[in-house]
């Protein structure tokens, strides 16, 4: 499990987004993390401590004078036992306290007394988020090395729409997992391709394949978690874009080729795992091809460019990774592919 053995202290502050923290605890525990929950008094008005105790399997702390903690030093014990402190949701009030070193409840005291990294997922009304005072606090926190996860833009509980809502639990978990990954690719730029291509026969038909893009998107996520700046050029797929990744949507092999060529300069790594069609119709019909009795239409096909093998710009990169699918003679095709690419250097 991706978070096996990791110890996370989760701070929950007051706000309607506190209900999302329950799902966050469930997902973190499912990935193997040990989660201890600390709540402000305001947070308990939205979700009860019993909910978090049931989901985490550990007592929940709301009072810095909790007698269950030796010497009444919960802010020390809970921070020293954690690999990270995660505050989600992080209210405007909490961000202000943290930026100015205030500590008047268990969550803010815990954050001030920590000797481990702190991640916070802001959640507030869009006007509160855009307020100059909040933005000054955000700038201070970022300069202090605190990782802010979000916020997102969308519908808010107050009925307004805009930036300020807490990102979803799944997105926070992605960021937490990424935080713990070794940053072997920090400072590197990675360009990737994924998914199928669609080669039009006419306005409604085309040649494609069964690629889902899952492998390419998983590799893109792993590269981002390793610290890389990732650009993903992908064919028509339904995969959600991993956080922090620049996604370029294309349809045909020619479009994918053009996008790769446009962005290849300055890249350190190219990973080509798209299922690019080998051939395309030479002259796609401008109109839908109608049935003509029993006569089947004939298609003239031309070869598509192979991004991995015919571009010196790509072959000159520090690292090139490509993939292909074969149904027989796997070793032979692998050796042949390597020989072809080596001969182009």
For each of these PLM feature ranges, what is it?
Residues 328:
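A metal-dependent hydrolase metal-coordination microenvironment
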Residues 1-118, 125-213, 217-309, 313, ...:
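A cross-family phosphate/adenosyl-ligand binding-site feature
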Residues 310, 340-345:
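Intrinsically disordered, highly charged
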């Amino acid at each position: 499990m991706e978070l096996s053995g990791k110890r996370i202290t989760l701070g929950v502050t007051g706000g309607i987004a506190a209900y999302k923290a329950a799902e966050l605890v469930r997902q973190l525990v499912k990935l193997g993390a040990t989660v201890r929950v600390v709540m402000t008094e305001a947070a308990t008005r939205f979700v009860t401590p019993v909910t978090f105790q049931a989901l985490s399997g550990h007592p929940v702390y709301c009072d810095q004078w909790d007698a269950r903690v030796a010497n009444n030093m919960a802010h020390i014990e809970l921070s020293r036992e954690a690999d990270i402190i995660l505050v989600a949701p992080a209210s405007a009030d909490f961000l202000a306290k943290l930026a100015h070193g205030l500590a008047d409840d268990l969550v803010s005291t815990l954050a001030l007394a920590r000797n481990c990294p702190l991640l916070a997922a802001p959640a507030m009304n869009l006007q509160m988020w855009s307020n100059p005072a909040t933005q000054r606090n955000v700038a201070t926190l970022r300069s202090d090395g605190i990782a802010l996860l979000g916020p997102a833009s969308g519908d808010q509980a107050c009925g307004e729409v805009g930036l300020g809502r807490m990102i979803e639990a799944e997105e926070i978990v992605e960021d937490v997992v990424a935080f713990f990954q070794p940053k072997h690719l920090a400072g590197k730029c990675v360009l990737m391709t994924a998914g199928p291509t669609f080669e039009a026969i006419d306005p409604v038909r085309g040649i494609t394949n069964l690629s889902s893009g899952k492998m390419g998107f998983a590799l893109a996520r792993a590269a981002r978690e390793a610290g890389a700046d990732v650009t993903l050029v992908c064919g028509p797929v339904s995969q959600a874009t991993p956080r922090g990744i620049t996604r370029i949507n294309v349809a045909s092999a020619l479009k994918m080729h053009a996008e790769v060529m446009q962005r290849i300069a300055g890249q350190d790594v190219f990973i080509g795992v798209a299922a690019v069609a080998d051939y395309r119709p030479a002259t796609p019909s401008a109109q839908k091809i109608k049935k003509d009795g029993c006569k089947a239409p004939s298609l003239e096909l031309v070869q598509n460019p192979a991004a991995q093998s015919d571009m010196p710009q790509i072959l000159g990169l520090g690292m090139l990774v490509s993939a292909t699918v074969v149904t027989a003679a796997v070793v032979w095709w692998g050796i042949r592919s390597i020989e072809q690419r080596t001969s182009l250097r």
